[in-house]
Amino acid sequence: MRSRPVALLAATLLVFSVDCAEIDITYNLVPAEAQVPIGYAASIWESILVSDVPIKVLVTWAPLGNATLGVTFPNGRRDFAGAPVPQTWYPTALANALAGTELNTGENDFEFYLNASSDWYYGTDGATPNGQYDLVSVALHEMGHGLGFVGLSKKEGATGSLGLLLQSDFAPLITAFPWPQLDTLPGIFDRFLAHPQNGPLDFMENPGTVLGSAMTSNQLRFNGAFAMDANGGVEPRIYSPSVFALGSSCVHLNESSYPEGNPNELMTPFSSTGSANHWPGPLCLAIMRDIGWTIAPDVGLAEQDQHHRIGVSPNPVIDQLNLLVPFPRMRKATIIDAMGRTVETTGIINSIDLCLLPPGSYSLRVEGTGQIVRFMKQ
């Protein structure tokens, strides 16, 4: 690497004892221009999660009507060797990561549909025009479901259930993998859902009317320890409106609690045109950790104090990364890529020329601050 005015130092190798995830995508009828932002979204998840087993994904481009941007179907396994919780369904991407081996040979780990009729923005810069939906954001959201931000809730009449979903509930959409017999067992995500008065959903009669009432109470919480820690000690709100919506209820963060502009907005049920979010957010990452995922060591879960946060712009960056380091003393900054290589600079930091770095996900650390900022290089 040639010398620069900001004194970039030679790259060295950092050794981590973990392997970030690899997401292998098969595209079905997806136009080439749409494959770029979908792959970009996958690279974000790859930089976050740790797994020795490649994650196999099928993406299908098909008309889904006017109200739906995407639909995800995770494959599942339960009671596998090393399963942390028995009698519980795990998405196979997570089950494979926990088992350290592929449990579903010849099958996809999850499949998702994207609406071919929607007006999509195919860029990866987050500059989504009014009237268009950001495909990176939606693909990132759907992959979040496939990786485990998903449950097995259903309500018919007054009766709610966990683990009674049928493939016919989602007709005419189908999956290439065999639909498992769920046997009235909850998913690992469901194990953390609770009503403030009636307790955890998996303690309720299943199927049952008390369970059904909780599912439409607008009061559901996620009671995982990491999620609570990332939410200031409070259980995050889960979307549970008074009218049950299959595929939306009980499998998203609450829309009104985490509206557009909130760092946790990605995994809420609704998306707006003209907006973009290319990061899962601290609550989603904490929930992933609660259900069993190992998060890469350079990924921070909690939000930093807004008045003392390190800032970077633009993000994604093409060549020049501008830094805001709101600390009076000079510090060392380290940029680490997904391969473990680091570029160091010292002194007062204003900007770094990254034009020679390959595209991908990176993390910026500033010595002595305890902060990590993620950014994408195009």
What are these regions (language model features)?
Residues 295-313, 319, 326, 342:
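Residue-level detector of functionally pivotal "anchor" positions at catalytic/ligand-binding pockets or at interdomain
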Residues 335-343, 362:
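Short, glycine-anchored, charge-dense loop/turn motifs used at functional sites
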Residues 326-331, 369:
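Short proline/glycine-enriched turn/loop motifs at strand-loop junctions of beta-rich domains
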Residues 20-140, 146-297:
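Extracellular zinc-dependent metalloprotease catalytic-domain scaffold
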Residues 53-55, 329-333:
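Short beta-strand/loop motifs in extracellular/secreted proteins, especially
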Residues 1-22:
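Bacterial Sec-dependent N-terminal signal peptides
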Residues 342-358, 371-372:
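Glycine-centered tight-turn motifs at strand-turn-strand junctions
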Residues 3, 359-378:
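C-terminal tail/sorting-segment detector
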